[in-house]
Regions:
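Beta-rich, blade/repeat-based domains predominating
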Residues: 51-65, 94-119, 153-172, 199-218, ...
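A short helix->beta-strand "capping" segment at the edge of beta-propeller domains
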Residues: 37-53
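Beta-propeller blade signature
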Residues: 132-140, 283-288, 335-345
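N-terminal secretory signal peptides
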Residues: 1-7, 16-27, 32-33
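A short beta-strand motif characteristic of beta-propeller blades
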Residues: 44-49, 86-92, 147-153, 192-201, ...
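Asp-box/WD-like beta-propeller blade repeats and closely related beta-sheet repeat scaffolds
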Residues: 130-167
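Conserved beta-strand positions in repeat-built beta-propeller and related beta-rich domains
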Residues: 52, 62-63, 69-74, 105, ...
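Short loop/turn segments that connect beta-strands within beta-propeller blades
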Residues: 82-85, 141-144, 186-190, 232-237, ...
Length: 345
């Protein structure tokens, strides 16, 4: 995403000030949702949330609260969004960063979040003589307290972590769309490995949404070109990367989420496509019958809300977030100022 620097700098300053005054989500194993009478918690088709300056890119479902969690690109927070549209901050700002992809690990009572000062650095809002702030954080799901902040650096001058997932062993995987990498981090916070492949490389936006499959491999989407990869043996010294052959490749792949039935929800937008607007916003559902060597399109739905970025799987449907990121990227005012939307597909 290449922001219009002057306009975007004004926008981020304004949004950060507003906040001071006041972001593919799948764990292993896949959740087995059951809407029993005691668990029933109906959600509206669309939640329009008033939150000036929040601008979420990532969303996750919190099964304990039966509520959504959203990150803030402008304020560096993680907030709880309840079924009535009310919002409260759970994780307070811990640095001048964007919180991008987030994931709930209910088994370990934690939230994982990719964070980066990429946008602030690009806009000259942080001291660029200092090293970039870029990493993956773990936070207490109950209290929001910081458990650990793990710097992730591969030597890039402007790294940008994007999405995060956790496997059944507790290892954390975070994508970097500028470094074109996937980094594996132990649950204790040690950087264990950086996974690279020539096919991850992009002139624009590279590795993006990522999910851990219960069978032990990863699925990762590359934004540019809409390519999907399966990474086998990600905990070994030599992971094996295979491209998933799609019947219809989308123009881009942003957020991903695995559903309990094994299908994969893919969010498509034109936020980072060359030239900006001109692509399409869509939500695509893919299914594989051969362990994600190939996949076919079950549904390709043009999305009615602008600039969707990712999706949260809940017991009550799959909810896609439209956080108004184009305003941060271009400085052009949102058509729904001070609001973001969560909509069921």
């Amino acid at each position: 995403m290449e922001p219009s620097l002057q306009a975007s700098r004004r926008t981020l300053l304004r949004l950060a000030a507003a906040g001071a005054a006041g972001g593919a989500i799948a764990a292993a194993p896949l959740p087995a949702f059951a809407a029993t009478g005691a668990d029933r918690c109906p959600l509206p088709r669309t939640l329009s949330v008033t939150a000036p300056g929040l601008y979420p890119e990532g969303v996750a479902w919190d099964p304990r609260r039966k509520a959504f969690l959203v990150g803030s690109t402008a304020q560096g927070t993680i907030s709880v969004v309840r079924a009535d549209g009310s919002l409260s901050v759970l994780v307070a700002p811990f640095a001048r960063v964007s919180v991008i992809g987030i994931q709930v690990d209910a088994v370990r009572g934690s939230i994982q979040a990719a964070y980066s000062d990429y946008f602030f650095r690009r806009l000259g809002m942080v001291d660029t003589s200092l090293p970039p702030v870029n990493g993956v954080g773990s936070f207490d799901l109950a209290t929001g307290a910081v458990r650990q902040l793990v710097p992730v650096s591969t030597g890039e001058s402007e790294p940008r972590t994007n999405d995060v997932t956790t496997d059944r062993h507790g290892d954390i995987y975070v994508t970097d769309t500028e470094a074109d990498t996937i980094t594996r981090v132990s649950r204790e916070g040690e950087v264990l490995q950086v996974i690279r492949d020539d096919r991850f490389t992009a002139d624009g936006t590279g590795p993006n949404g990522i999910v851990a499959h219960p069978a032990g491999y990863l699925l990762m989407g590359k934004y540019d070109g809409g390519r999907l990869f399966r990474i086998d043996h990600p905990r070994s010294a030599r992971p094996v990367v295979r491209e998933v052959r799609l019947d219809r490749a989308p123009a881009s792949i942003d957020g991903l989420a695995l559903r309990p039935d094994g299908s994969l929800v893919v969010v498509v937008n034109d936020l980072s496509l060359p030239g900006g607007a001109g692509g399409r916003d869509a939500v695509v559902v893919l299914r594989s019958t051969d362990g994600w060597r190939t996949a076919r399109t079950l549904r390709d739905q043009t999305w009615p809300l602008a600039d969707p970025t990712t999706v949260a799987v809940t017991p009550y449907g799959d909810y896609v977030v439209s956080g108004g990121l184009r305003e941060i990227l271009t400085g052009v005012p949102s058509t729904t100022p001070g609001q973001f939307q969560l909509r069921r597909r």
